[in-house]
Design a protein with these regions (language model features):
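Feature marking well-ordered beta-strand scaffolds used for ligand recognition
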Residues: 1-397
Length: 397
């Protein structure tokens, strides 16, 4: 399979400052993109699953002309919307598909492990079975442990798990942690109507920073990876906390609250800057919230951040975020108490959609921004203009 982006498929831009479109790919007509990560000349894209597709692999040796090399369908009744790649391995989650009425039949629940001897043609070497509803998100930057959120048997909702990948052909659970009350035989202690559930953990030194839905930020001590324990927790109005990105050199973290409700006028979900320099975290400021989108249909609000993985563009000053119908937003945290928006990019709605739904993004080491649309827009490749490129160079960690 080979499919190359063409000028005829290039979308028009609704609004932009600091970023411009370099290329677009419709992912072979399966445009429901989710997590995206670049490693060398290979780009890995997970799919939300509404199209039935699971994973796409593209050759991006020429970023202006990505070529679709391989696609795998999602297993029945499941989706595989998250991808991580490092140390010659590709990890792909398997989870019960949540976006349509339940159907009979088995669910694929766990984590697939692929070798990347040929980065464009992965070969599966293992599957770790989680049971239950499966693995929602995995974070892995290489090394022994992969960090996952999953709902295994016997739990009400997603908890935090670690898998030991020291033998990639035989992954094994190394540890798990959950908020008291999540296990089915425990009594929940959080307010009625709230949800306490792990989304994912980002690791900095001996600390894991978890977005934990209505529990907000949860910080765990992982100095012994096999015995995690709670250090601190911070919540705020709104909930639905998704990502907590540590900026360890500055004692900060950036948190997104995921918009999970269609508009118009859904609850506000935004981006916050947190002080995590001590064991009592605090909210410092909110990032500017885009105007003019609240009355639109579908999702408007924060979702994913570029997560500063090794091998990517890394900054403790510039934050890249997806905002669904408000596109990509770039914030400057030079003064963390007064974050400023310094760039944005938004395409016209893809065919058949009332608005864009930009979903996830990855900023590569060269400064290109790879972005997906969750419904049908596929993949966008953005490049910074000279002003933003200079700022990115100055702000690089």
């Amino acid at each position: 399979m080979t499919s190359t982006a063409t000028a005829a498929s290039t979308p028009t831009v609704a609004s932009a400052a600091g970023l411009r479109l370099l290329a677009h790919h419709d992912l072979g007509g399966h445009g429901d993109g989710m997590q995206v990560i670049r490693r060398g000349d290979a780009l890995y894209v997970g799919h939300v699953g509404t199209s039935g597709m699971g994973t796409s692999i593209l050759d991006v040796a020429d970023p202006a002309a990505p070529e679709l090399v391989m696609q795998w369908a999602a297993p029945p009744h499941s989706h595989t919307h998250k991808v991580q790649a490092a140390d010659g391995l590709l990890l792909v989650n398997h989870e019960k598909f949540p976006y349509r009425a339940p159907a009979g039949g088995p669910v694929s629940a766990g984590l697939a492990v692929y070798r990347l001897d040929d980065p464009l043609r992965p070969e599966q070497v293992a599957f770790w079975r989680s049971g239950g509803r499966g693995v929602h998100r995995v974070v892995w930057t290489g090394g022994r442990y992969a960090h996952m959120s999953a709902t295994p048997e016997g739990f009400r909702d997603r908890i935090w798990l670690m898998a030991d990948l020291s033998d990639p052909a035989h992954p094994a659970e190394a540890a798990r942690w959950w908020w008291p009350g999540q296990r089915a035989d425990e009594q929940p202690g959080w307010p009625e109507g709230q949800r306490y559930a792990a989304h994912h953990a980002l690791i900095a030194g001996s600390r894991a920073y978890l977005g934990y839905d209505d529990a907000g930020l949860v910080v765990l001590d992982v100095s012994d990876m096999t015995r995690p324990h709670l250090v601190s927790q911070l919540s705020w109005d709104g909930g639905s906390t998704h990502t907590c990105l540590p900026l360890p050199g500055r004692g900060l973290a950036v948190a997104t609250d995921e918009q999970v409700t269609d508009g118009p006028y859904a609850p506000r979900r935004s981006v916050r800057v947190l002080d995590v320099s001590g064991e009592s975290p605090a909210v410092l400021a909110g990032c500017p919230h885009p105007d003019g989108f609240a009355g639109l249909p579908l999702r408007f609000g924060a979702h994913n951040l570029h997560e500063n993985q090794p091998g990517s563009y890394r900054s403790e000053r510039l934050v890249f975020a997806t905002y669904f119908s408000a596109g990509v937003r770039v914030y400057d945290l030079a003064d963390p108490r007064r974050p400023a928006e310094v760039a944005h990019w938004l395409p016209q709605p893809p065919p058949g959609q009332p608005v864009a739904q930009l979903n996830d993004l990855f900023v590569d080491d060269g400064g290109l921004v790879w972005v997906t649309d969750r419904i049908g827009g596929g993949l966008y490749v953005l490049e910074p203009d000279s002003r933003l490129a200079a700022l990115m160079a100055e702000a690089r960690t």
